[in-house]
Amino acid sequence: MLSKETRKLKTHIMLTQIINGKILTPQGWLKDGSVLISDGKILEVTNCDLAVVGATLIDAKGMYIVPGGVEIHVHGGGGRDFMEGTEEAFHAAVATHMKHGTTSIFPTLSSSTIPMIRAAAETTEKLMAEKDSPVLGLHLEGHYFNMKMAGGQIPENIKNPDPEEYIPLLEETHCIKRWDAAPELPGAMQFGKYITSKGVLASVGHTQAEFEDILTAYEVGYTHATHFYNAMPGFHKRREYKYEGTVESIYLLDDMTVEVVADGIHVPPLSLIHISEP
């Protein structure tokens, strides 16, 4: 039941008010409050659940009210893959995610050929130009990876960083916002430094990097780790010597950010607990 009590605001704009839900705020969960929205923007989050006069009410009883998800690593959706590179595939995949709480998205390509990347970039730029588009840019997961850590990548597309490829590509396109690579590869430090100078997020992924590699990579611009724990080694031994793996090395750098596939399968629940500790 909605409260019969109301409150008035001095405004002539169209308002939408979400009430009765459990609201996630930076200070924690807020029960029995409300969120006031106008023209797609949040005007107010309050612990008062009195209905605002003139506002369209949405009753969220039994539900959570949380910020929309920003999907930074996603390969497709709705039965379509961003590797297809077509507007039809992109629209179908993006629409699927928009139905499930995502509000912004970075379509992701696995290790691809340059023509495939160009096709996807062209489509991405078209979608970014649409009004109120949720597409914020293109994410390239590869193809400069360690072959031994290829995982689900396409092996024949994997190679060492090649400036004759990536420099022209970044000059021709304007939508690539993130590019993942294995920093121990020949040319990977030059690659990371260059793409960072162009405003592209350099991320460590599909790698066998040890601490010295990670430290140098961080210094030249690699500040993120792709699906942390996956396709990267932990602590290991070579002959009588022991070495920090990629995982421990990233933990040692407080300013590096990570992403995890938090399904309890790619990363065990206990590891998720460790990651989430302050």
Region locations from a protein language model:
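N-terminal metal-binding scaffold of metallo-dependent hydrolase/deaminase domains
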Residues: 2, 7-51
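Divalent metal-coordination and catalytic microenvironments
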Residues: 21, 35, 40, 62, ...
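Divalent metal-dependent hydrolysis catalytic cores, especially in the metallo-beta-lactamase
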Residues: 75, 91-120, 133-146, 173-184, ...
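Active-site loop-to-helix "anion-binding N-cap" substructures in soluble metabolic enzymes
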Residues: 79-84, 96, 106, 110-116, ...
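Charged helix-capping and loop-helix junction motifs
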Residues: 86-89, 120-123, 162, 240-246
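Divalent metal-binding pocket/active-site signature
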Residues: 140, 147-163, 168-244
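Residue-level detector of conserved catalytic or cofactor/ligand-binding positions
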Residues: 270-278
